[in-house]
């Protein structure tokens, strides 16, 4: 059996994607190449992501196809792809109709020929009546034809080039046919007016897209540009990508921290808002970990770099946001497919309107039906939808990132809008996870000191918060030689040999399994039972605190229409009930093993798939549950690679109230996307009907077409604010 070769994903920066059909043109052209599985263009950043089989199609072939379409190409200035060397590409084609600066657009320069055309057109209109059907009519033509060429030269040239390439059914082709058709039926003023309206509208569309692109990119400006590298007693400014692990860097007040590292010298206040969305400053000191993207506010910091820039927290965050568009929502996929078929269908409908009625309706005026067909051609470009829908989703993702919420794709934005059940893990999610030993209860002759010592040493290799709290209460150093045969028993506890004694520390289930008689503790807190050489030694009571915003988080979710809030925990029934009652949860399930949480999630899932379930955990211990939920949400992503890798949505802080905020952003995005779809399709349907029955003019049609595109784009940019 032959095995398929692994697919490769390549990212490229494409210049000149300010036109309404560029996205469809590039995606469609690349996906027709044999071996290309998917091509996805992000209009907002000019980023192209191509997934392909390198055995069937080469990267060179893909680059040549993009260059043949008339776009410039370079490797993206990505936070994670600049590790090492760059391979800039400069594929140019003279005469491409759009600016090639990945969003750079000179409106003043583009407006000059259009304004000249408007002046000439105005003169032609003023003298149209006096000169009509007179020898002086040639003067009218001498003014109006240059006006047509000035306003439409770019459109005509692009349409001609695209026809030679076999690329028809874009807006340039449609406007060329519509205006040449108007000229053919002696509608000169209308032909010029349509081209002028279209060109002015297109210019403002390009300007609006460029502006929204810049506003969205501004959300992602946390990327540090330089690093102050300390080497051989000197400090020099270098690119963060060139700094190596264990290098020393200096961060001055007001500067962004360029790389993740450990503070060796200096104390300061840092602003973490670029990562968390919250501008509350935190204090850092020698020994603390500091992350790229934070802003140093006061002291001078000397930092030892612990990660390359490509592996830093901010690089992963930026890459996640920039690449979120590759995971498209069903709405976005539908619009892309719809746009590919809609334009050809309307073109053929236009042909039918122009040709059939004069053949079958006695006395039908051929020029009148041709005019109606031209109106349909003008309205047949789905520009507003093609740009505004992806722009809306990207704005939602960028706006959420500004508030410390990372959403990995528009498909998860859509899923969040339908969430009706939210399931929380307890420890570290609803509670602080900062455990403290509150009581040591001894049995069978053990002292408190002896029990705490044995427990701390037995737990010395564990990273669980409960183990950390026991070691913190013991407050003495523990040598590795004091502990042997350490074994972690998932969902139960640990076993280790301490001072030649077999120590078991864990929950009720562990002692039941070992058939050791022990107390049944009816207390609100986490109980760690201890047994030494099979003899019960007592238990340690550990308390956890509920997070300050946990109660408000549940209230917000209820207010938003979430029908059920549930907590899953491995803790005892008593502890779970106490937390659930204090917070106001609808239900809880206690004493669960990690694998049992997945079973509980499956029981809560909606069989129809319409009502979505979100699970909120720490992204590390809850990976299987996060993967099984409709929407997996990981909290505390700040500095946690595992959380960023695992979940569909990452909350950079530990605040459960961010869950409601994420759902709010998703619903706002969805609302604006639906508004744009209804607006664009409604206007187009209206003018198709009016055009067919002869109640719409070319002027009105082009005004409606470019107007609705502008409105949809401007509406989409509201999401990011």
Swiss-Prot record:
| Molecular-function GO term, any one | ATP binding
All residue ranges annotated as the HMA domain in the record:
8-74
Using the record, list the residue span of the signal peptide; answer none if the entry has no such feature: none
Q: What residues sit in the active site?
A: 425
Keyword annotations from UniProtKB, A to Z: ATP-binding, Cell membrane, Ion transport, Magnesium, Membrane, Metal-binding, Nucleotide-binding, Phosphoprotein, Translocase, Transmembrane, Transmembrane helix, Transport, Zinc, Zinc transport
What PROSITE patterns does the entry give? ATPASE_E1_E2 (PS00154), HMA_1 (PS01047), HMA_2 (PS50846)
Residue numbers on the Cytoplasmic membrane side: 1-107, 161-167, 211-344, 388-671, 718-721
Name the segments for region: Disordered.
80-101
Task: Tell me where it resides.
Answer: Cell membrane
Report whether Ion transport shows up as a keyword of the record. yes
For this chain's UniProt record, which GO biological process terms are given? metal ion transport; transmembrane transport
Task: Identify one Gene Ontology CC term for this UniProt entry.
Answer: plasma membrane
What is the disulfide pattern of this chain? none
Q: Where is it mainly found?
A: membrane
Keyword RNA-binding attributed: no
Q: Which reaction does it catalyse?
A: Zn(2+)(in) + ATP + H2O = Zn(2+)(out) + ADP + phosphate + H(+)
User: What single Pfam family name could you report for this chain, choosing any that match?
Assistant: E1-E2_ATPase
The family database entries (NCBIfam families) matched by this protein are listed as:
ATPase-IB2_Cd, ATPase-IB_hvy, ATPase_P-type
The molecule here is called Zinc-transporting ATPase
The organism is Synechocystis sp. (strain ATCC 27184 / PCC 6803 / Kazusa)
The protein's gene is named ziaA
